[in-house]
Amino acid sequence: MTLQQQIIKALGAKPQINAEEEIRRSVDFLKSYLQTYPFIKSLVLGISGGQDSTLAGKLCQMAINELRLETGNESLQFIAVRLPYGVQADEQDCQDAIAFIQPDRVLTVNIKGAVLASEQALREAGIELSDFVRGNEKARERMKAQYSIAGMTSGVVVGTDHAAEAITGFFTKYGDGGTDINPLYRLNKRQGKQLLAALACPEHLYKKAPTADLEDDRPSLPDEVALGVTYDNIDDYLEGKNVPQQVARTIENWYLKTEHKRRPPITVFDDFWKK
C-alpha cells in the first residue's frame, strides 16, 4: 500500500460522494450521539463566516431541529458562537452565515481582551510572543470560550475538521483542533462545497479564499499560501488521483510532520514518532 493509499484510508476519504447522502450521514451521526447521551442538551460551535463552520453549523441546526420534532425535547439547542478578535474583517460574511444557519441561539465573545491579557502576563514572566504563537493563542482562546459555554449549557463542542485540513495538520493543537465531535471528518474541501450547494447556501460563503486569519503581520493570509499547495491539489490527492511529484511530496511532508496533532498525547506505548 502506498503512502497516499494509507493516508486516504486513515482519513476515511472517498473519491466521490452523493451530497444528499453525506448530509444525512452527518445529521444522523449528530442525532445518534445526542440520543446516546441524553444529558447533552446543546451543540456549541464557533462561526467564522467561512465554508467549514457554515457547513458544520447548518448540519448541527438540522440535527437539533429534527431531534426536537421527533422527541418533543425542547431543551435541545444549537448555540452559534461569534468569536471575533476586535473587529472582524469579513463581518458581513459571518452575518450571512448566521442568517443561512438560523441558529437557536447566537452568542458573541470578543477574544481580544483575553488574548492581550494572556500575552501581557507572559511578557511579565519574560516570554515575548511571536506573531505566529499569538495566532495560536487566539485559536486556543476561542476554544476555551466554547468549552466554557458548553460547560454551562450541558453541551459538547463541535469541530470543523475535515480530510483536507487533517491531512496537513492545518489547525492549532488544542485550539480549533480540540473539539468533542467532528461531523465533517472524511470530506475534502470540494465535497464540503457540494454539501453547501445542496443546502442552498449563498455561494460567496464557500467560494471565498479560505483563511485562518490568525496572524497580525499577515492578515487574511490564504490557507493555500501558508500550505504551499492548493486545496484542489489536496482534494485530488485525497481522491486517489495522480498529482505532480512535488505536490505529493509537500502534502505527505505536512502529513508526516503533523501526525502528533491527529493523536492523543504521546505515551510510552506509541512508536509512530520513531518511524
UniProtKB/Swiss-Prot annotation:
Catalytically driven reaction(s): deamido-NAD(+) + NH4(+) + ATP = AMP + diphosphate + NAD(+) + H(+)
Binding-site residues for deamido-NAD(+), renumbered to this chain: 33, 136, 140, 173, 180, 260-261
PTM section of the record: May be phosphorylated.
Positions contributing to ATP binding: 46-53, 82, 88, 160, 189, 211
Record note on quaternary structure: Homodimer.
Keywords, comma-separated and alphabetical: ATP-binding, Ligase, Magnesium, Metal-binding, NAD, Nucleotide-binding, Phosphoprotein
Enzyme Commission identifier(s): 6.3.1.5
Matching InterPro entries: NAD/GMP_synthase, NAD_synthase, NH(3)-dep_NAD(+)_synth, Rossmann-like_a/b/a_fold
Family indicated by similarity: Belongs to the NAD synthetase family.
Cellular component per GO, a single term: cytosol
Positions annotated to bind Mg(2+): 52, 165
Name of the coding gene: nadE
Native species: Escherichia coli (strain K12)
GO molecular function ontology, one term from the record: protein homodimerization activity
UniProt cross-references to PANTHER family, sorted A to Z: NH 3 /GLUTAMINE-DEPENDENT NAD + SYNTHETASE, NH(3)-DEPENDENT NAD(+) SYNTHETASE
Enzyme class, spelled out: ligase
Metabolic or biological pathway: Cofactor biosynthesis; NAD(+) biosynthesis; NAD(+) from deamido-NAD(+) (ammonia route): step 1/1
Function (record text): Catalyzes the ATP-dependent amidation of deamido-NAD to form NAD. Uses ammonia as a nitrogen source.
GO terms (BP aspect): 'de novo' NAD biosynthetic process from L-aspartate; DNA damage response; NAD biosynthetic process via the salvage pathway
Protein name: NH(3)-dependent NAD(+) synthetase
